[in-house]
Swiss-Prot record:
It holds the Pfam family DUF1292. Belongs to the UPF0473 family. This is UPF0473 protein LSEI_0788. InterPro entries: UPF0473. PANTHER family: UPF0473 PROTEIN CBO2561/CLC_2432, UPF0473 PROTEIN CBO2561_CLC_2432. Signal peptide: none annotated. HAMAP family: UPF0473 (MF_01448).
Length: 106
């Protein structure tokens, strides 16, 4: 289980450029980052910066090596290959989204 105490919502200025298999660059906004004690890793969840707020967005998730400031935008990103690790990331994302929805209703 991830340690939710370390969930950090993305800052407005935290953006990461990803390059796809065709060499195309796309700018992504950091949704949030978190640390997992179980896996000993940090994770970042991203969504395309070009998406508007009223559209459903595809969220990308990676483990990352933070820079000296703990920033995901300057560190190295790594794919998540383990199914159990994916399940943990999805659980944290669902909790984050549920918390965000409840805050909107307040």
């Amino acid at each position: 289980m991830a340690n939710n105490e370390h969930v950090t919502p993305g800052e407005d200025d935290q953006q990461i450029t990803l390059i796809d298999e065709k060499g195309n660059e796309e700018l992504y906004q950091v949704l949030f980052t978190f640390d997992s004690e179980d896996y000993g890793k940090s994770y970042v969840l991203l969504y395309p910066a070009s998406e508007s707020d009223d559209q459903e967005v595809e969220i990308q998730a990676f483990s990352f090596t933070p820079d000296e400031n703990g920033d995901a935008s300057s560190g190295d990103l790594f794919p998540i290959d383990d199914d159990a690790e994916w399940d943990m990331v999805e659980e944290v994302l669902n909790t984050f989204l549920a918390d965000d929805d409840s805050n909107l209703k307040d």
